[in-house]
């Protein structure tokens, strides 16, 4: 079974950890092969961005392991990942790998798992690999379009298809290992009450712009002071 998952951009506007969009600029493609066994998982990476990916602590292996454990299925799995999304540049590359893996494996095994449960598993795999789950990235890659996470327990999301184009600027910079974990250390842990009303207003305008397909309103609401 072969599945493709596209890259994503998250933290749109004031939607920190809740708003993300799938983009067709880059993608990962995952093939899975299963046979009777005891749960052994082998991962193999190739493609333009396959260097320096650990064979043990990667989201393909971790997401497959979580899926097998939660589904109580004992099979051996061979996962081949064509890595077409650059890592460390904020494009949801590790999340896309996890998404393509759980989708391909669930289809190959004939498991009737809904997409939000698959997104949850992919997010948990990212947490194990990088220190924090990115439910916005993985949900966008899995569902497509622009999504807003509105519940974590259970995981739920709204999906939109805004009538516009996204221009993607990818910086050619070297990022540290576990970039997201490093960056989250410098994010403020507390906020002043005065910062809340403008952010809530912009989020309301953002959602309204998505429902009404107003690119002008969406653009006006993208400012984030936090």
What are these regions (language model features)?
Residues 14, 25, 54-62, 92-100, ...:
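Conserved active-site and cofactor/substrate-binding residues in soluble primary-metabolism enzymes
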Residues 1-89, 107, 111-115, 144:
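ATP-binding N-lobe of GHMP and related small-molecule kinases
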Residues 9-12, 21-24, 71, 130-133, ...:
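Solvent-exposed alpha-helices and their adjacent loops that cap or buttress functional pockets
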Residues 69-154:
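Gly/Ser-rich oxyanion-binding loop with an adjacent helix/lid
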Residues 157-226:
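C-terminal nucleotide
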Residues 1-2, 39-40, 77-78, 138-139, ...:
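Structural motif
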Residues 4-6, 22, 141-143, 150, ...:
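Short beta-strand segments
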């Amino acid at each position: 079974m072969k599945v493709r998952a596209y890259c994503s951009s998250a933290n749109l506007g004031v939607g920190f950890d809740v708003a993300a969009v799938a983009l067709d600029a880059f993608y990962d493609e995952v093939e899975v092969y299963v046979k009777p066994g005891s749960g052994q998982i082998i991962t193999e990476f190739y493609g333009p961005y396959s260097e320096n990916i650990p064979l043990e602590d990667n989201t393909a292996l971790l997401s497959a392991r979580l899926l097998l454990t939660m589904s109580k299925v004992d099979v051996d799995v061979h996962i081949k990942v064509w890595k077409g999304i650059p890592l460390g540049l904020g494009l949801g590359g590790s999340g896309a790998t996890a998404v393509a893996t759980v989708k391909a494996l669930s289809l190959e095994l004939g498991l009737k798992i809904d997409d939000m449960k698959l997104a949850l598993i992919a997010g948990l795999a990212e947490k194990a690999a990088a220190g924090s789950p990115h439910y916005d990235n993985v949900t966008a890659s899995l569902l497509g379009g622009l999504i807003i996470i509105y519940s974590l327990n259970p995981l739920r999301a709204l999906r939109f298809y805004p009538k516009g184009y996204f221009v993607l600027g990818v910086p050619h910079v070297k990022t540290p290992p576990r970039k997201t974990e490093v960056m989250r250390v410098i994010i403020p842990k507390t906020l002043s009450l005065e910062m809340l009303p403008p952010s809530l207003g912009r989020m309301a305008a953002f959602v309204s712009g998505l429902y009404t397909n107003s690119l002008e309103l969406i653009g006006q609401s993208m400012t984030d002071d936090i």
